A protein has these predicted regions:
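Short, flexible catalytic-loop segment of classical short-chain dehydrogenase/reductase
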Residues: 49, 86-97
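Alpha-helical segment proximal to the catalytic Tyr-Lys
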Residues: 33, 73-78, 139
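Short C-terminal tail/terminal secondary-structure segment
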Residues: 50, 130-131, 142-155
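Active-site helix of classical SDR
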Residues: 28, 61
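Active-site loop immediately N-terminal to the catalytic Tyr-X3-Lys motif
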Residues: 6, 50-56, 118, 136
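Residue(s) in the substrate-gating loop at a strand-loop-helix junction
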Residues: 45
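Substrate-binding pocket helix/loop in short-chain dehydrogenase/reductase
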Residues: 3-5, 9-14, 107, 111
Length: 155
């Protein structure tokens, strides 16, 4: 729901925070209690790094995910590494609906977002970043939010 904060219904605020932040907290707490060592990877969003008119509630939730990631990386070290992945433009059904775009408008979206690598991302791009963060190759990486967006910066 894209709506200015001043007219956003309170129940929509609570629902968005529950889905996008409280659920991440719950997953992190469950993992922290049940694994002796390893990696937790949270999914963030560029919306959590600055103003997103009409989606302030979502941005607030994702900023909370970033803060949770940084805090847990310190609290769970050295046994568990905690990082985040910040996906860029991935043309999922949910994103297209939120932007009121159709699959026929992907070229328009690519141009609008000015992505230096010249293509929209795929779920596999995000998965590959998560595999890296979970691997031994990232054994000295913790408390980081990895942008995976083809070189584009969140607006």
């Amino acid at each position: 729901m894209r709506q200015p904060m001043t007219t956003l219904p309170r129940d929509e605020w609570h629902r968005t925070i529950a889905v996008n932040l409280t659920s991440v907290y719950g997953g992190c707490m469950t993992a922290a209690r049940h694994i002796d060592q390893g990696s937790i990877i949270n999914i963030s969003s560029g919306a959590g790094t600055g103003p997103v008119p009409g989606s302030g509630h979502y941005g607030a939730a994702k900023a909370g995910v970033n803060s949770l990631t940084w805090t847990l990386s310190a609290e769970l070290a050295p046994r568990i590494r905690v990082n985040g992945v910040m996906p860029g433009a991935i043309p999922t059904e949910v994103m297209l609906k939120a932007l009121k775009k159709s699959e026929d408008q992907l070229d328009e979206l690519l141009e609008e977002w000015n992505i230096p690598l010249g293509r929209l991302g795929t779920p596999q791009d995000i998965g590959s970043a998560c595999v890296y963060l979970a691997s031994d190759a990232a054994s000295w990486v913790s408390g980081e939010i990895l942008r995976v967006g083809g070189g584009a910066k969140p607006k």
